[in-house]
């Protein structure tokens, strides 16, 4: 799949190794105009160009860079934003209509007409990048909500920014809402079991820092994999967590009694598999790394 109008981008000062894997997995499935990793770490890789940035000491720093700094580094018509927990999974799901819009991301749960969408795996036009830079927003975090909800009416009226309709966004990516069909990409560590298998999953887990590995999203990944009929993947995740993270009570308890619902699970939204029961969906996963 040739996407010669799109630059593949990740910005990560915490998990650059995992972000590089997201770039690698995406490049295995599509040819991009360019691939760039923005980080403060000394990274040597042939997977992407590495551009040094000041360290992101908070999520707000990341958001400000995405809103104000990214435009200066992009020469293509579009950028595809990936993160350590979101990347391309099915190039055959690409739809040229995605590029009819300035922003495409997985739909959120909101029912007010402003539910597109998640920024962790998102397609953005160069026009949008210039608009977010020039707007000089005083509130920047989280950047996807600032673009797609808080300031969406302003971006539409002042800059003519076009957001993809929900039906098309569902074909592009998913996060908390399963589409029931293959999508171009996904976001969310809890969904990684749908995208990776075997050595690729092991490489991804190894690339995570201990603090991220022991966090709620990775534990929810194990829970959802178990509920989705892949206890082997759940056990792979949990064993990695227990081997590296001290006093991770949630992982230890789930290893002992995996069929129980535990208090460590995220309370923000229902898990994908819990929401849809047995109607879970999984594309052909990546099972190896180059």
Residue ranges and their predicted role:
Residues 20, 47-48, 89-93, 133:
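Short glycine-/acidic-enriched loop or helix-start segments at secondary-structure transitions
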Residues 79:
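Short aromatic/hydrophobic "clamp" motif used to bind/position activated sugar donors
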Residues 82-83:
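Active-site acidic Asp-centered loop
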Residues 87-116:
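Conserved donor-nucleotide/metal-binding helix-loop-beta segment in metal-dependent transferases, i.e.
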Residues 29-30, 73-74, 95-99, 124:
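Short, conserved loop/helix-junction motifs that constitute active-site signature segments
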Residues 1-6, 183, 188-290:
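Non-catalytic N-terminal targeting/anchoring module and adjacent flexible stem/linker
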Residues 116-233:
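Catalytic core and acceptor-binding pocket of nucleotide-sugar-dependent glycosyltransferases
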Residues 1-63, 69-74, 230, 234, ...:
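N-terminal anchoring/stem segment of glycosyltransferases
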């Amino acid at each position: 799949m040739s996407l010669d109008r799109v630059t593949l981008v990740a910005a990560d000062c915490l998990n650059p190794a995992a972000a590089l894997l997201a770039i690698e997995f995406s490049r295995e499935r599509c040819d991009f105009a360019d691939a760039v990793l923005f980080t403060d770490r000394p990274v040597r890789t042939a997977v992407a160009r590495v551009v040094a940035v000041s360290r992101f000491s908070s999520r707000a720093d990341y958001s400000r860079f995405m809103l104000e700094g990214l435009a200066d580094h992009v020469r293509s018509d579009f950028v595809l934003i990936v993160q350590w927990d979101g990347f391309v999974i099915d190039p055959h799901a690409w739809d040229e209509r995605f590029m009819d819009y300035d922003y495409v991301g997985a739909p959120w749960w909101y029912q007010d007409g402003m539910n597109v969408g998640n920024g962790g795996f998102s397609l953005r036009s160069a026009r949008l990048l210039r608009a977010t830079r020039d707007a000089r927003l005083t509130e920047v975090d989280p950047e996807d909500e600032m673009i797609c909800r808080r300031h969406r009416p302003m971006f539409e009226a002042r800059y003519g920014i076009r957001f993809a309709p929900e039906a098309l966004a569902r074909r592009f990516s998913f996060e908390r809402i399963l589409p029931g069909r293959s999508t171009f990409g996904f976001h969310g560590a809890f969904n990684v079991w749908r995208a990776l298998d075997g050595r690729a999953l092991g490489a991804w887990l190894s690339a995570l820092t201990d603090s991220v590995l022991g966090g709620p999203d990775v534990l929810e990944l194990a829970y959802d994999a178990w509920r989705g009929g892949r206890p082997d993947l759940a056990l792979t995740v949990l064993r990695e967590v227990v081997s590296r993270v001290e006093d991770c009570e949630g992982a230890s308890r789930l290893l002992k009694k995996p069929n129980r619902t535990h208090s460590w699970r995220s309370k923000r939204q229902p898990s994908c598999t819990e929401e849809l029961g047995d109607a879970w969906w999984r594309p052909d996963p990546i099972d190896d790394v180059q």
